[in-house]
Design a protein with these regions (language model features):
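Acidic/aromatic-lined carbohydrate-recognition and catalytic surfaces
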Residues: 1-160, 171, 182-229, 238, ...
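Short hydrophobic/charged patches on amphipathic alpha-helices used for structural packing
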Residues: 6-9, 166, 318
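Alpha-helix termination/capping residues and helix-transition junctions
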Residues: 14, 171-173, 287, 323-324
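Residue-level detector of family-conserved "landmark" positions at structurally sensitive sites
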Residues: 22, 70-71, 179, 331-332, ...
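Residue-level marker of motif borders
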Residues: 65, 121-123, 175, 294-296, ...
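Conserved alpha/beta catalytic core and glycan-binding cleft of carbohydrate-active enzymes
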Residues: 78-110, 199, 203-359
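A Trp-anchored, charged/polar loop motif used as the substrate-binding/catalytic surface
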Residues: 154-165, 169, 270-281
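Active-site groove signature of glycoside hydrolases
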Residues: 163-188, 290, 294-302
């Protein structure tokens, strides 16, 4: 819980870390590890209270440690009051807060779920069925009867609410945000121009009001993310094979099973550095002196970096991560070689990811 983190701040400080990214701690239905939020303005009871968060920030700042909040910008829980009101047949302020088609049978290429509410429409999901997509608009409209442009007043209101959430946690002491699925908010945005404009506008606001606030993206395309105003982007598995080619290309290590091959940091010597360099060097040159690329040890979605590795391999991997240009992120427990536990029963939507989400070993 939050008070437990506060108690361990000296441990984090003694290792030399200067910031903490917290996974979602909001009130949630916990069908996807807290990434299905029911109340963006309230700490979940299992983690403490808003006052506990404020205390954590205060004490962390005294120790020279910044606190970054996980901003789940693209969706909520089905149990969120916003979504419950959006399900109503009567028009209200939340009618267009989420993406709905114009007919319960129109599931839009399988991206939407019909038959859930009395409302005659199908809601768009972002990942699991329990994560209805907030409506930030469509950059390219192919069904004008229900798709709205990003400039529509209702879309601007959704964006205004997102900014309100960010400002609320800043007032309690937050120093920045890691934005979940940052590139996916505006739909049918094939070249990324609309979402870049969206985040650039937010960055402009925050530069004026909160110039020390850091914005970190789960975009996986640093040149686009930094052009959008983010300070840091993770070069991970979502767009390029570069990250996976370093550590997790083998079938048994790549738990999401997106890319296949051989890792460079594998003592069997079957991998190569070219796959990584082809992507990394291009992104590095495009972002140099404008923002930072992060090569993390892992996160809540990946098998732990220690999985199937020797301590010698891990020492070399950490030396690489800690000396590369950019901002290193260390997933909790990786600093002690914490192990991934395969075939664990799924917990709160973790599935194969559950083995990376265990308590400190």
């Amino acid at each position: 819980d939050l008070n437990g983190i506060t108690e361990k701040l000296n441990y984090i400080k003694d290792m030399g870390f200067t910031a903490i990214w917290l996974n979602p701690f909001y009130e949630s239905s916990y069908r996807d590890g807290g990434y299905d939020v029911t109340d963006f303005y309230k700490v979940g009871k299992r983690y403490g209270t808003n006052a506990d968060f404020k205390r954590l920030c205060t004490i962390a700042h005294q120790k020279g440690i910044k606190i970054c909040v996980d901003l789940v910008a693209g969706h909520t829980s089905l149990e969120c009051e916003w979504f419950k009101k959006s399900c109503c047949t009567e028009k209200n302020e939340y009618t267009n807060r989420y993406v709905w088609t114009d007919n319960w049978l129109n599931i839009y290429n399988g991206e939407c779920i019909g038959g859930y509410a009395q409302r005659n429409g199908a809601y768009m999901k972002n990942f699991f069925y329990c994560q209805p997509a907030l409506n930030y608009g469509f950059a390219n409209i192919d069904e004008p009867s229900w798709q709205l442009p990003p400039e529509h007043p209702d879309r601007r209101e959704t964006k205004r609410e997102l900014i309100n959430i960010m400002e609320y946690w800043i007032t309690l002491g937050a120093d920045g945000f890691r934005v979940d699925l940052a590139a996916s908010l505006i739909k049918n945005d094939y070249d990324g121009r609309a979402i870049i404009k969206f985040w650039r506008e937010i960055r402009t606001i925050f530069d004026e009001k909160y110039p020390e606030c850091v914005l970190i993206s789960e975009w996986s395309h640093p040149s686009q993310a930094i052009a959008a105003g983010f300070h840091i982007d993770f070069l991970i598995h979502a767009v390029f094979p570069a990250y996976t080619s370093l550590f997790r290309a083998e079938d048994e290590r790549d738990v999401p099973r997106i890319f296949f091959g051989n890792s460079f940091f594998d003592t069997r010597g079957n991998g190569n550095i070219e796959t990584f360099l082809n992507d990394y060097l291009d992104e590095y040159e495009k972002t140099k002196d404008r923002g930072f690329i992060s090569i993390p040890t892992g996160n809540h979605d990946l098998a732990r970096i220690s999985y199937g590795r020797t301590n010698t391999e891990l020492e070399v991997i950490f030396a690489f991560i800690m000396t590369m240009p950019g901002i290193p992120f260390v997933y909790y427990g990786d600093e002690i070689g914490m192990e991934y536990i395969p075939d664990m029963p799924s917990k709160e939507g973790g599935f194969t990811r559950t083995g990376s989400r265990t308590p400190m070993q």
